[in-house]
């Protein structure tokens, strides 16, 4: 059971998420003050800031297996350097199919200079709101990995979450290694919202 201090930290993250998401909706939909307050309260008191996501494939080995994995994903209201960090295992829309989602490591963000191992390719700098994502499996070739080496930079707006826990099998599961900053932020969320039994029930063997 989570301690009182952990609950306070969890509620602080939940409040930040609720406010950020509600203000985002307000800017796009021009909500009334009453509607804005209702959404904030709904997200704060009734919603979760995590969800379950299934994924498989060799691209994220060893964090994930080639078989089915059930992931606990922390929702990201706005994908910027305040919420996601280099080294995080992020969930993003497939740049070639917006109905599908990928799990990849965030390798670089706007302002980073990207230098290819191929001398024929010119270095370039990631533009505003661009990021570079890579597969974790070092044994895969670039085309097999299906990451930014294949489809290029992606919009940070396409990042929807961060994987914080992975259930590979009923007896093989644990927290996902992310940046130190992210893992520190995610620890109270794991303490409160992680339900391994629920993950196991949703797991597709």
Curated annotation (Swiss-Prot):
One of its GO terms (biological process) is signal peptide processing. One of its GO terms (molecular function) is serine-type endopeptidase activity. It is an enzyme of class 3 (hydrolase). Keywords: Hydrolase, Membrane, Mitochondrion, Mitochondrion inner membrane. It comes from the Eukaryota. PANTHER family: MITOCHONDRIAL ATP-INDEPENDENT INNER MEMBRANE PROTEASE SUBUNIT 2, OSJNBA0068L06.9 PROTEIN. Heterodimer of 2 subunits, IMP1A/B and IMP12. Belongs to the peptidase S26 family. IMP1 subfamily. This is Mitochondrial ATP-independent inner membrane protease subunit 2. It comes from Arabidopsis thaliana (Mouse-ear cress).
């Amino acid at each position: 059971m989570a301690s009182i201090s952990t609950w306070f930290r969890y509620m602080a993250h939940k409040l930040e998420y609720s406010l950020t998401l509600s203000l985002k909706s307000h800017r796009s939909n021009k909500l009334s003050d009453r509607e804005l307050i209702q959404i904030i309260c709904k997200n704060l008191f009734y919603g979760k800031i995590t969800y379950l996501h299934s994924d498989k494939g060799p691209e994220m080995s060893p964090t994930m297996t080639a078989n089915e994995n059930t992931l606990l994903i922390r929702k990201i209201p706005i994908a910027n350097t305040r919420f996601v960090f280099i080294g995080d295992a992020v969930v993003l829309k497939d740049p070639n199919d917006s109905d599908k989602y990928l799990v990849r490591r965030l390798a670089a963000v706007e302002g980073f200079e990207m230098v290819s191992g191929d001398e024929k390719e010119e270095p370039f700098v990631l533009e505003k709101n661009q990021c570079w994502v890579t597969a974790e499996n070092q044994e895969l070739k670039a085309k097999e990995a299906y990451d930014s080496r294949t489809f290029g930079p992606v919009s940070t707006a396409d990042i929807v979450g961060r994987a914080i826990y992975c259930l590979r099998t009923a007896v093989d599961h644990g927290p996902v290694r992310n940046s130190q900053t992210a893992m520190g932020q995610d620890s109270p969320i794991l303490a409160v919202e992680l339900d391994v039994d629920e993950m196991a029930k949703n797991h597709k063997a």
